[in-house]
């Protein structure tokens, strides 16, 4: 994995000339840039420090009008080369670029004092002292300050030495294995088709692989790859990459989108961000402020919502919800920059702590968990994200972007949490997990729901799984309800009998008139045997209405006394068991059974035989083929 160095500094301080002197590569690719002598777009170069180590260099524009491009380039760098012209010293974009680098989480770098051939030695010493003083307290405090001249070559070898030394301190596996490439250019190349370019943030991309453009959702395959202008089989994190895509038109793509492997990024219209307002900001950031929001290669208008305050004062840090006009993809730990409208300047920056946020009320109970996400790592971070997700749970793919964990580490951590009974996989198809604290809360709520149901429906044994899902489980993943029920049944907190769920202490409570009705109905249907009365006949004979008996029919079915064969007929279970027994005995010596065979077997008239045969088919005891029936294997 290459190390990436980015330049920073004021316009016309010699960043591009210095890179050309170091590498021989002119980073100004636009005719306008070469004519005007300023960098507008990002420039890219490389320097082979050793046969094994190639340094990628991103040359960012210094003009204040092109700060959005500077942010795009700085997002993927490991360390910064702050360029300050000896004849001018520290200037406005010097300050803004350093602040942006700090907000983007860059924690290492060095300084080049350029144009030293244009100043006297004593002036150079004064500028050196000024820079040292300015950098005190910043991440560049104590960093090497190297006087150089791109014109004469003075100091270049010394600068290369410091760059090589700093590059050697970065671990090769410092980035995750989730491939992402923010698109900064889209164009058509004659004979090749659509090409996108960008700098890979993490992971790797190979020829022929399928990719997804996020958030648009377009799919394509990698037709060709170039890394630093050379054809390649694979592009890795930190490399300047051009990707030739199959079957996509330029109009279908735009700067700011992200290339990724399919179903690895999940756009959201809300991000939770740990936001810091710059100490140098002239004003606080107010709740509901609309801002220019920069992330990767995208600039978009967004609104900031503070959950525990009305404004964020300069120098303060707080959790903030960033809400976008459309869903965008992010990953835990990604850095972002906020610029004000008027004047247009950098005022804040932040770090994504939840890329799958959801709108919450101010002073929400989620604030306690959100406030811990910035410093959380490993198991603690995983559990916090599962807690925020609540009853919906999270898939492994979602947890990957919510923790930025390398895939093998994530799988191992989930196994450890499962062993500790702190996280549970309730959907093996989607690999979806829920936290133990969420599950415990749901278990308590489910027991309360069942208790309330028993109080409301004293004549019912309980309720079915389907009723529990449509009632208590509304808005929950159905598989989570099943998982929860299994745990409650296994622990003995809930009883499951004939698909009816009830609390252990619940018994059906009947008033005296209901007890009499129960006896009447049970006696009538049991004594009727294989030819019970129709529902209508039973009601008329006993002066009852359908409303009078609805609950009792349901209770007797739950208790296993009656079986509903059709809207017209209920059978005593003992009678139906007798019919099923006769049918099974018949098939011990016969391959098929016709309607007349069944009537002869049961002595039922057509009025009873047809609904009973249809019931046997529905219960998968028999199978109808034409006008015959065959027995189903148990």
UniProtKB/Swiss-Prot annotation:
This is Selenocysteine-specific elongation factor. One of its GO terms (molecular function) is GTP binding. Residues 9-16 are annotated as: G1. Residues 114-117 are annotated as: G4. Translation factor necessary for the incorporation of selenocysteine into proteins. It probably replaces EF-Tu for the insertion of selenocysteine directed by the UGA codon. SelB binds GTP and GDP. GO terms for cellular component: cytosol. Residues 59-62 are annotated as: G3. It comes from the Bacteria. It is found in: Cytoplasm. The keyword GTP-binding applies. GO terms for biological process: selenocysteine incorporation. NCBIfam families: selB, small_GTP. Residues 1-173 form the tr-type G domain.
